[in-house]
């Protein structure tokens, strides 16, 4: 697919699929269960007349396990590969997760990922901009994207996504490499809505770039299943984040209670909604706001079972009324999340 085709396929999406939590955990989800969920995502996307979107990572678990799952899935279901757009993160040290954005490191990351996945990758993204390589006055290292452009010319990847970038970086990279850019991946949820206030979302709208919204369920906070730090399994990185300490949760869960009591519980039985569906609906409702009409907000929840996929990908259920959307945003003006996105306890 050309970059234009990739952008068009992404723009058709309502919801994409994040595969990180299948493997980046103390005990990976068994392949058989993961494959059922992955297959259901493709099935639902087909029914809606567009490709599925798989968001994967070179470092989402040891020994390329995340990419191995994708490789084995398509080995089992080869006819489904044409129905999926794969976006892969790399460009980092797989052990320490520090950015490795040199030309040779990025080329090697792409080649490692292509080898692990078993072939062509539609979209590749350096997970974090390696600012250690920037010379004075630069906001991103040219060589990282020069390497990706070479990989596109060699036909091993199709386009570039940006990841965890700021407004200045988006503009600079778009100026130099815009013909290769397909989308921008950043965090957006009711607990982390910075992109709506720091210029990122407005810049994407101005430049016509879709916004891939990771962690739309607040890393589990918006599922209703987390009540205390003890609910987080040992070995899960969230356990050591300030946002998920018991003291922080007491304050952060006030938002969840508001959503449950003022939105979920007040819905009639014939139009029920879950907390997760509400959270996804809030992200997608920004597509109705005129100032963002040039972009497309696409949440990429996970889903380790068919039932979770069905819940998260129910496009009729994951909708809010304008009144609900406005009530939530009014509440958010006085609510402040305790703990930054990656702040340790």
Curated annotation (Swiss-Prot):
Catalysed transformations (reactions): pyridoxine + NADP(+) = pyridoxal + NADPH + H(+)
Alphabetized GO MF terms: aldo-keto reductase (NADPH) activity; pyridoxine:NADP 4-dehydrogenase activity
Primary site of residence: cytoplasm
Keyword Secreted included in the entry's annotation: no
CDD domains xref list: AKR_AKR8A1-2
Cellular component terms (Gene Ontology): cytoplasm; nucleus
Keywords: Cytoplasm, NADP, Nucleus, Oxidoreductase
Domain of life: Eukaryota
Keyword Oxidoreductase: yes
Cell compartments where the protein resides: Cytoplasm; Nucleus
EC number: 1.1.1.65
Residue positions of the active site: 60 (proton donor)
Gene Ontology annotations of biological process type: vitamin B6 catabolic process
Protein family membership: Belongs to the aldo/keto reductase family.
Note: Present with 2190 molecules/cell in log phase SD medium.
Function: Catalyzes the reduction of pyridoxal (PL) with NADPH and oxidation of pyridoxine (PN) with NADP(+).
Name of this chain's protein: Putative pyridoxal reductase
Organism field: Saccharomyces cerevisiae (strain ATCC 204508 / S288c) (Baker's yeast)
Organism lineage: Eukaryota, Fungi, Dikarya, Ascomycota, Saccharomycotina
